[in-house]
Amino acid sequence: MDFAGAGNSVVVGVDGSPGSQRAVGWGAREASRMALPLILVHGFGIPDAFAGEAVPPGDWLSAHELHAERLLAGARRQAWRIDPDLPVTVEASLDGPIPLLVKKSDTARMLVLGSAGRSALRDLLIGSTALALAVHGHSPITVVRGGEPASDAPVVVGVDGYAPAEPWIGLAFEEAAARDVELVAVHVWNDFDLAEAFGFVRDPFGTAPREDAEREVLDRSLAPWRVKYPEVSVRAVAEREQPRTRLLDWSARAQLLVAGSRGRGGFRGMLLGSTAQALIHHSECPVLVARSPLD
């Protein structure tokens, strides 16, 4: 594993929902593919009613510990059905889900969450959790969305070109190599890019058509990763459109969509880029969001 800052495990948040079960399956396959241990965690949190107490009442605690134990035991059995030799550990915590997962992100290669499918309210809550983890966590986060993608579907990565470095491109190459599938690198621009509005110059000589200049940006961003992963077949796509629109279109044909936490025009201190937010809430396939160098 060569992803910068990568940890040594795949961590999945477990709550027993159908979306969580999908996340466990996805996380188990990812851990097996990357030869990493799988950690299944459940944080039930202490309700506000007990906030002033050192520990909640014993009957409440016992009931929640038993529930967590059953949830995690079922999730571990599910993971072992996918790979009987996979190292799996489980952890229940009094911490709430977000504090627990942020803490686990310190040593995780990736955090994995499920989506809620048909439940709009639950999906909103999970989306909020994912956004919080994308902002405060220290590892990439995958939200497992959509149906079961075809095994030969490509990995798709959004390439910005403005960031001083885009480590998620390397992560996308690694994921495509592990799956032995094509990588589609999508670079999208429009006439209202914030970078242009603030005077950043993309073509200092003013001679190349915009399309040629943007294609050069894409090729330059991919060049070092093509050298590092020569076995990965790459399709480079440069288009004039809204980034979120085209990436969401591609999500219907991909098995994994990879993006940075902030894109062009992203400023230090902003919570999360609008494109990353749209992908977390609306992607039709699992979406992996990696932190921007500005974070």
Identify what each model region corresponds to:
Residues 1-6, 19, 59-62, 77-111, ...:
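Structural beta-alpha unit
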Residues 2-58, 154-205, 226-237, 295:
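Small/aliphatic-rich secondary-structure junction motif
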Residues 34-37, 86, 139, 181-182, ...:
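Short glycine/serine/threonine/alanine-rich loop segments
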Residues 129-147:
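Short, structured interface segments
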Residues 182-261, 268-270:
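Structured core of small recognition/catalytic domains
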